């Protein structure tokens, strides 16, 4: 879709947008269970509304970024995904937290290649400045690692992606947004 024909705006997600959120997540994660249940998204919106960011194109949701506030001391150290998200049923957010934890970024397949993910990350960075948060933390999948798992370790794969010898849609995106890999998370 040509950029000059779009009417994009950043917004905070609302509960009324859940059907559109569900559609985006179902498209992005068909093999991983699809969208989180409505009560989980509603809890995120209730607990930390500013951290649930969307991009709309002429009123249609085309991208989302979900986040929670966490304690930097706890989550900058080894932890598991389940320490943040309990089976997509409960998400733990700490209103006194001093860091932002990025849970997810999803862009509609019709709007990829328009740097919307970067716009969502920029909105997260601005939120950190506004709240004087210490950092953005995130755990990310390396979805194309399975193609190379017989010939290299996950850390070797990460190094090759970092040196642009390999491309991984999630890790390459995070690295291009100035994130640094600190460690591998256990399942």
What are the language-model segments listed below?
Residues 1-43, 47-76:
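Short amphipathic alpha-helix that is part of the acyltransferase structural core
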Residues 51-53, 101-106:
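Core nucleotidyl-transferase/polymerase catalytic module
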Residues 57, 87-92, 122-133:
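Short amphipathic alpha-helices and their capping/turn segments at secondary-structure boundaries
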Residues 107, 113-129, 135-138:
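Conserved acetyl-CoA-binding loop-helix of GNAT-fold acetyltransferases
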Residues 65-104, 122, 138, 142-167, ...:
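Conserved acyl-donor/pantetheine-binding loop and adjacent beta-alpha core of acyl/acetyltransferases
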Residues 30, 133, 175-184:
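Conserved acetyl-CoA-binding loop of GNAT-fold acetyltransferases
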Residues 167-177:
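Short alpha-helix
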């Amino acid at each position: 879709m040509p950029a000059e024909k779009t009417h994009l705006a950043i917004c905070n997600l609302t509960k009324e947008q859940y059907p559109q959120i569900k559609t985006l997540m179902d498209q992005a994660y068909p093999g991983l269970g699809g969208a989180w249940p409505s009560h989980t998204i509603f809890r995120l919106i209730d607990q930390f509304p500013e951290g649930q960011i969307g991009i709309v194109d002429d009123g249609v949701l085309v991208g989302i970024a979900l986040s929670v506030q966490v304690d930097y001391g706890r989550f900058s150290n080894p932890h598991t995904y389940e320490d943040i998200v309990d089976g997509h049923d409960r998400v733990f957010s700490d209103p006194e937290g001093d860091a932002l934890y990025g849970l997810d970024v999803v862009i509609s397949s019709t709007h990829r290649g328009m740097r919307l993910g970067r716009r969502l990350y920029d909105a997260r960075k601005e939120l950190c400045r506004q709240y004087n948060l210490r950092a953005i933390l995130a755990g990310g999948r390396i979805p194309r690692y399975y193609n190379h798992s017989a010939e290299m370790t996950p850390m070797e794969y990460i190094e090759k992606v970092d040196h642009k010898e390999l491309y991984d849609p999630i890790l390459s995106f995070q690295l291009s947004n100035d994130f640094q890999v600190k460690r591998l998370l256990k399942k």
